[in-house]
Amino acid sequence: MATSQYFDFAQGGGPQYSAQPPTLPLPTVGASYTAQPTPGMDPAVNPAFPPAAPAGYGGYQPHSGQDFAYGSRPQEPVPTATTMATYQDSYSYGQSAAARSYEDRPYFQSAALQSGRMTAADSGQPGTQEACGQPSPHGSHSHAQPPQQAPIVESGQPASTLSSGYTYPTATGVQPESSASIVTSYPPPSYNPTCTAYTAPSYPNYDASVYSAASPFYPPAQPPPPPGPPQQLPPPPAPAGSGSSPRADSKPPLPSKLPRPKAGPRQLQLHYCDICKISCAGPQTYREHLGGQKHRKKEAAQKTGVQPNGSPRGVQAQLHCDLCAVSCTGADAYAAHIRGSKHQKVFKLHAKLGKPIPTLEPALATESPPGAEAKPTSPTGPSVCASSRPALAKRPVASKALCEGPPEPQAAGCRPQWGKPAQPKLEGPGAPTQGGSKEAPAGCSDAQPVGPEYVEEVFSDEGRVLRFHCKLCECSFNDLNAKDLHVRGRRHRLQYRKKVNPDLPIATEPSSRARKVLEERMRKQRHLAEERLEQLRRWHAERRRLEEEPPQDVPPHAPPDWAQPLLMGRPESPASAPLQPGRRPASSDDRHVMCKHATIYPTEQELLAVQRAVSHAERALKLVSDTLAEEDRGRREEEGDKRSSVAPQTRVLKGVMRVGILAKGLLLRGDRNVRLALLCSEKPTHSLLRRIAQQLPRQLQMVTEDEYEVSSDPEANIVISSCEEPRMQVTISVTSPLMREDPSTDPGVEEPQADAGDVLSPKKCLESLAALRHARWFQARASGLQPCVIVIRVLRDLCRRVPTWGALPAWAMELLVEKAVSSAAGPLGPGDAVRRVLECVATGTLLTDGPGLQDPCERDQTDALEPMTLQEREDVTASAQHALRMLAFRQTHKVLGMDLLPPRHRLGARFRKRQRGPGEGEEGAGEKKRGRRGGEGLV
């Protein structure tokens, strides 16, 4: 049949050539060129072919240049109409006799590539598709078209002319050339003025090597015209631009009857990158650009919606050029960019390609949507076709536009408009901001110029301005625009503030590097703060462990060692389980000590009563000091005493200090007496004591409405007793630091010697001074030692209950407890601390031949146990040894003078299968309690 003779390439092999001219059936008048989409390709835009001019049948001859034919293979199912451009790479370059004189090198495709191409079937059915060849000045390329409605065929036409494809108009066409013409003299293809949007064709199914080898031979895509009614063409003298079979190579050329149009200049291929706004001269340069670092950065910036060309030094960009995708920091910089060579180059390139050029009015980059730059758009051009349906969403890649020929008018609605400026056009360069000399936060180009007088002009010998030199910044520049930008810039403003005007305001927005350094510093500070907080939490947890009742020490379901079978070996003890550092399980001794401490701690009512009485006494003594100072001043004025003294305005009463158990926080339940030390500027006398005792009741009435009784002790004490329950007594000891000083140390100081009989008891005054020193030492050394205060309270209760321990001085006991607890290797619980103190006493610390206790608050070596006799020391040592034996046999409650605490309920404790009777458990418990009550405590 005619179709099988027209396509004569074998399937799966390379192009075959034959020297015998085949007998070709000539097409009828109504025949038209058809194109079908190639199977196996992704949907793409189907470009149209240039229309062919009618030619006569008798004068038919093959094209004098290269003949383009397509290989044939069995018919495959034709897919539905697609919208993306499908590029078919099955080329076979058959050479005619006339073309062999100038073309020696055939272009062949591999068999693997040709085997996957779609051609017409060898059968002569009406649905047979035909392939057409189109000459190109740079190679061979075919564009497949989707099958559309076939034109109406006249009754006189043969069946071989039936086709399903587009019918092309005959407005323009490519005329056949003579056999003597060369390849580069082909006329430029004519384009349909109707242009549609370019949809950025992609090649998802192409191998990279195939694309690299075939990309130089891609001709420009042609826009498809809308399908129109079938046209009846007059009989042409010869078909122009028709495809020829491989066997038509040996057919002698027929003389051309139509005039050949004048060929225009050869158009170079332009490879355009929409992302970078640049063009490449060749495919190799274009591929290198796509693999370059600059293109990858801009592509990544488009995906994330960040402007690739941000403003320098972290300053937020204000103006944006949509044509070059460049951000400017101000109106001056934007105007300089518009005048620059880069913008002009991109402008000329867009004008040459026929791409839409956005308005030159600056658009605020901050007000544009973040995805405006990254949104892939399809630029229009003369070699771009619009698709009938939108393409599938793909990642934005650089589109390659092969542009040839002059640009054509844009089609209406081909692509959306470029982003219009949302704000009106800004003022020209040099417009100062409203803030005066203040720097604009968005950039420094809009700020008012600062210090232009420090920029001097450098002239040549002829008097021509060579450059500008800034004396503040020690920099030079050649352009007047650069000078204007410099005096508005941040660097110049910083130097101006540093050297000329320190009060010049400058925007404090840091640069990207400074911001990173600040963030790193803040991160380190947060890390250190978290570590300190974690240490503080651990310290508080340790304190709560010592003060509060810790969790159960024995884990649940822990059977005793003897309950395991002999063959299983000895299991690990519960204490060997990993515990948190600083945490220890609570013992029975700890529970008993803490329970005893809770019973001897003063009640809230007692603490409030002590606080109220002490506060009233301190305020009343302050008023007494003021009254005595006024009396002394009046007496001196009356006597006319003009003798100069070291401190003429010194008060007699200097201050009052808390001492004893009140200052140390060792109050127990039932304590009703607290002590205060009243310091004087001179040695206290009995007359001063009487004056204080007389003034104090009147000042107490002025301070409070509570009733107090004031009494004086001839031994340098004043007692204030409250008349309300609980009755608290505040003992005030009058003393002076002069009682401890040696008069011989300051021989040059002359002091009036008081009467020896009028001075208060030196012993009582020294005891008051010693109590003041003891309170300061305790607050510095023992108050921060957590179990120390608890143990001292428990031992004070022991000294109060047991007469044997009553002989131990309170100050010696405090020193002993502090030494025992502070010398431990690790933190101790309350029970272990009591045991350690008893061990120290039991080893003979209190005996005369023992180490003893050195008083740290005395100048000379003084034993704190000096008031104790030898018998008392031995009795306390023996009592401590007996207490240790009771602790070893779990009789801690007898040492502390309390009842035995019930054991804790454990989840893993054994239970009886048979429930106890109503009175069985209670009776047994009562017998045990009665038996234990018969024991004896400390003696």
UniProtKB/Swiss-Prot annotation:
It comes from Homo sapiens (Human). InterPro entries: DZF_dom, DZF_dom_C, DZF_dom_N, Matrin/U1-like-C_Znf_C2H2, NT_sf, Znf_C2H2_sf, Znf_C2H2_type. Residues 137-147, 157-184 have a biased composition (Polar residues). Residues 570-935 form the DZF domain. The gene is ZFR2. GO terms for molecular function: double-stranded RNA binding; single-stranded RNA binding; zinc ion binding. PROSITE patterns: DZF (PS51703). It holds the Pfam family zf-met. Residues 906-916 have a biased composition (Basic residues). This is Zinc finger RNA-binding protein 2. Keywords: Coiled coil.
